[in-house]
Amino acid sequence: YELIMENKDDLAKILTAEMGKPLAEALGEITYGASFVEWFSEEAKRVYGDTIPGHQDDKRIVVVKQPIGVVGAITPWNFPNAMITRKVAPALAVGCSVVLRPPTQTPLSALALAYLADKAGMPPGIFNVVMGTDSSGMGKELCSNDLVRKITFTGSTEVGRILMRQCSD
């Protein structure tokens, strides 16, 4: 959060340069995106299990919450910073690593956020950005790779249906 806010002017300029959003709106998006990082990092402190009374007085049920594993995140071009932080921050907060597939139109915001994550000391392999022109191939890989346990996607209904089919195959 702090590094995003310290670098908000540069992040906004990157966002404006890559997709044409007016600078004032880009600054607003950076601040909005940073709020997800702040909120989910604070919520991470409250991710713990539950102890539930059992069916007998001397029994109890213990619920343990564990990270699901690798999360594949596919984001749209129109809110490149906010959609990334909205998807990546909760996954990281609960201990999952992320493979982010930003859109081909706006990859620079993703790379800038990955750079800041690295600068913050995030270990290699935790927040990963994959780029390329074969969008359907990369989506299919995220959906079919056994290491990826969850997909988060924002985009068109048509692509959402394709991803849903690929995930269920």
Q: Locations of the language-model features?
A:
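Anion (oxyanion) recognition and catalysis
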Residues: M5, L92, S168
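Residue-level signal for inorganic ion chemistry
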Residues: L15, V37, G95, F127, ...
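A broad detector of the eukaryotic-type serine/threonine protein kinase catalytic domain
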Residues: T16-A24, P76, C96, S135, ...
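Conserved small-residue-rich beta-alpha loop and adjacent elements
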Residues: D50-P124
